From Swiss-Prot:
The keyword ATP-binding applies. One of its GO terms (molecular function) is NAD binding. Pfam families: NAD_kinase_C (PF20143). The keyword Membrane does not apply. Keywords: ATP-binding, Cytoplasm, Kinase, NAD, NADP, Nucleotide-binding, Transferase. This is NAD kinase 2. NAD(+) binds at N122, E123, R149, D151, T162, A163, Y164, N165, K166, S167, A186, N226. The lineage of its organism: Bacteria, Bacillati, Bacillota, Bacilli, Bacillales. Involved in the regulation of the intracellular balance of NAD and NADP, and is a key enzyme in the biosynthesis of NADP. Catalyzes specifically the phosphorylation on 2'-hydroxyl of the adenosine moiety of NAD to yield NADP.
Length: 265
């Protein structure tokens, strides 16, 4: 692993969190690391909180490929954090015992109306801003696949497949499989209107395109991981697996499937 010694702590700046993070900073300093207040100077970014804090940390720091991300949970271990705040010394023990590895997690690249793209680590969701059936023309690469009618769609990465995607009965996907999963939210299926009616996987080299069918009021709400984006006039949405990857510090004996087993079985 390349030398990294500038560490930045990402957390919610409340009094209780500042008190909780201070011992972490002291421990990092005692291990020879430089604690920096400017994230641009960091090559290690530690999120303190939970899965949501980790998603915020990657988004707010623009999914930096030159940094190593570490998740520390304040409650219990999550899918992204491998360490808890009360046992942070175990992280440094793992370093010493070489019981760590760097995982590269895929991100989604989302382009709306050919504007500058944004990225998601878990998923991108598209939903109607009004309580009525939402219509999307669905294209796989250049092929028109279906006309979707329903509440919306979720497009997830493999690591994001255990989140919002799973709540709508999407499949849990091994992160070693470069892919994006497309899942329906309350699709309309009857004798007149049909959709595939199930989630489907696209290989990592394909592009999903969603065209919003407008009737004057159907402007979608775009969800990027745990944030809602205010993009009022989105009409053409392209989603693909990005070349941008997030490098995350993980324990060797705490794999994705260990976490699936603990959380769901």
């Amino acid at each position: 692993m390349e030398d990294r010694n500038n560490i930045y702590f990402f957390y919610k700046h409340t009094k209780s969190m500042q008190e909780a993070v201070e011992p972490l900073k002291q421990l990092a300093t005692s291990q020879g690391l430089n604690v920096v207040d400017d994230v641009q100077k960091a090559n290690i970014i530690v999120s303190v909180g939970g899965n949501n804090a980790f998603l915020q940390a990657t988004r707010k720091t623009n999914f930096r490929s030159d940094c190593l991300y570490v998740g520390v949970s304040t409650d219990r271990e999550g899918f992204y954090p491998d360490f808890t705040i009360n046992e942070i010394d175990k992280m440094f023990e793992a370093f010493e015992n070489q019981n760590i590895e760097v995982k590269r997690l895929s991100t989604l690249e989302v382009t709306i109306d050919d504007e500058k793209p944004f990225y998601c680590l878990n998923e991108c969701s598209i939903r109607s801003n009004v309580i009525k059936t939402f219509v999307l023309e669905v294209f796989i690469d250049d092929m028109h696949f279906e006309t979707f009618r329903g509440d919306g769609m979720i497009v997830s990465t493999p690591t994001g497949s255990t989140a919002y995607n799973k709540s709508v009965r999407g499949a849990v996907v091994d992160p070693r499989l470069p892919s994006l999963q497309v899942s329906e939210i309350a699709s309309l299926n009857n004798n007149t209107y049909r959709t595939l009616g199930t989630s489907f996987l696209l290989s990592g080299d394909r592009t999903l395109r969603l065209k919003v069918v407008q009737d004057g009021n159907d402007f979608p709400i775009i969800g990027a991981d745990n944030e809602a984006l205010s993009i009022r006039h989105a009409e053409d949405i392209k989603i693909r697996l990005s070349d941008k990857q997030v490098k995350v510090l993980k324990l060797k004996d705490n794999t994705f499937w260990h976490k699936v087993q603990r959380n769901f079985l």
